[in-house]
From Swiss-Prot:
It comes from Penicillium citrinum. Glycans are attached at N45. The chain crosses the membrane at residues 59-79, 92-112, 139-159. This is Epoxidase gkaX. Its EC number is 1.14.-.-. GO terms for cellular component: membrane. The gene is gkaX. GO terms for molecular function: oxidoreductase activity. Residues 1-18 form the signal peptide.
C-alpha cells in the first residue's frame, strides 16, 4: 500500500470507528428501550438487573475498544502530515471530532451510577425508573457527543481528501 493510500485510509478511520460507536449508542437505545414496554412490566423487576449485569460483560468490549480507537485515530490524524490538514482546512474538524468524542467520557460517572441502580434493582419494585433515567442520559449523550463527533470526522475526512 502506498503512503498516499495509507494516509487516505488514516483520514477515514475516525469516521469509520465513530460510526461503530454511534451505532452502538443507537442500538443500546433501541434494544434497551424494549424494557420500558408495558408488555414486559410484570417481568422487569426480576429480570432486568440480572440481564444488565450479565449483558454488560458481553458488550463492554465495544466501549473499551471503540472509544479509545476514536481517540487514537483522531490524534494520529492530527500528527500525520499536519501541513496537509492545515492546507485543506480539515484540522479544525479533526480537533472538534476528538473534542466531542472525548466528551462522551464526561458522562461516565453518571452512567455508572445509573447502571449500578439498575443492577441493584433500585427503586425496589420499579427498576424501570432507573432504566428510564439511563435511557434518557444515553440519548442525550449520543446527541451531544457521539453524533457531533461522527459529523465532524466525516467533514474532516471529506475536506482532507
Amino acid at each position: 500500500m502506498s503512503l498516499s493510500t495509507s494516509l487516505r485510509l488514516l483520514r477515514l478511520l475516525p469516521a469509520i470507528s465513530s460510526t461503530a460507536t454511534l451505532q452502538f449508542a443507537l442500538d443500546e437505545h433501541l434494544i434497551f428501550g424494549t424494557w420500558m414496554g408495558s408488555f414486559l412490566r410484570p417481568h422487569v423487576n426480576i429480570t432486568l438487573p440480572t440481564w444488565w449485569t450479565h449483558g454488560g460483560r458481553r458488550w463492554q468490549w465495544i466501549l473499551i475498544i471503540g472509544y479509545p480507537l476514536n481517540y487514537l485515530f483522531g490524534i494520529l490524524n492530527l500528527v500525520a502530515r499536519y501541513d496537509q490538514l492545515q492546507s485543506t482546512g480539515s484540522t479544525i474538524w479533526y480537533v472538534l471530532g476528538l473534542f466531542f468524542s472525548v466528551g462522551h467520557m464526561l458522562f461516565v460517572k453518571m452512567a455508572l451510577g445509573r447502571i449500578a441502580a439498575i443492577e441493584k434493582g433500585v427503586p425496589k419494585d420499579n427498576v424501570r425508573v432507573s432504566m428510564g433515567k439511563w435511557l434518557q442520559m444515553n440519548w442525550v449523550r449520543a446527541l451531544i457527543t457521539d453524533l457531533p463527533a461522527w459529523i465532524c470526522w466525516i467533514m474532516a475526512a471529506v475536506s482532507a481528501m
